[in-house]
Design a protein with these regions (language model features):
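ATP phosphate-binding glycine-rich loop and adjacent ATP-lid/helix-beta elements
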Residues: 127-132
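N-terminal accessory segment detector
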Residues: 1-100, 107-126, 137-138, 142-157, ...
Length: 166
């Protein structure tokens, strides 16, 4: 069986896994929001992604990533997101200082599945914010995360700020 798996190019396997994961979660989110309502969905989704974000600390530690500056924290969360979401995810840093780093997603598998499935509500805002909260708090509690733009809400890109606490 492994020979059959190895006959599929790695990029194709990664794309299929990404589409399967993000597509399934968007479909589940849609069903859950319809069954439980917006408030309960956002409560569940926020808690789910906050806990998931906490794994960023172990990820960064396991591969020896520095986490002492906003840019290092963004790089660690960026790499974890890229590994988790595959080649559809396109992220860039648009600002970086000693106290603040601004990241931007211009292509996102979650947003693509949201469009493909015609989901009519914000499946990402609370989850993205809470994932960022969990990740940044776990990696370095001296910093905060704030989602400032969201493609699902009509922005041209998603954007977030990692900032030193004042």
């Amino acid at each position: 069986m492994s020979r059959k798996l190895e006959s599929i190019p790695e990029k194709t396997r990664w794309e299929m896994a990404t589409k399967g994961l993000t597509g399934a979660y968007i479909a589940i989110s849609n069903a859950l929001q319809r069954a439980a309502g917006k408030e309960k969905f956002e409560e569940f989704n926020g808690n789910f992604w906050h806990e998931a974000g906490k794994g960023a600390k172990e990820f960064a530690k396991s591969i020896g990533l520095p986490t002492d500056t906003p840019e290092n924290i963004e790089a660690a969360t960026h790499l974890l997101a890229q590994v988790s979401m595959g080649p559809e995810l396109q992220i860039e840093v648009v600002e970086s200082t000693k106290d603040r780093c601004v990241g931007r997603t211009t292509q996102c598998p979650w947003h693509k599945r949201w469009q493909e499935q015609g989901v009519g509500f914000d499946t990402c805002g609370v989850g993205h914010q809470r994932w960022g909260d969990g990740a940044v708090e776990a990696i370095n509690p001296g910093f905060t995360f704030k989602l400032t733009k969201n493609m699902v809400r009509g922005d041209a890109y998603c954007e977030w700020v990692i900032e030193r606490k004042k």
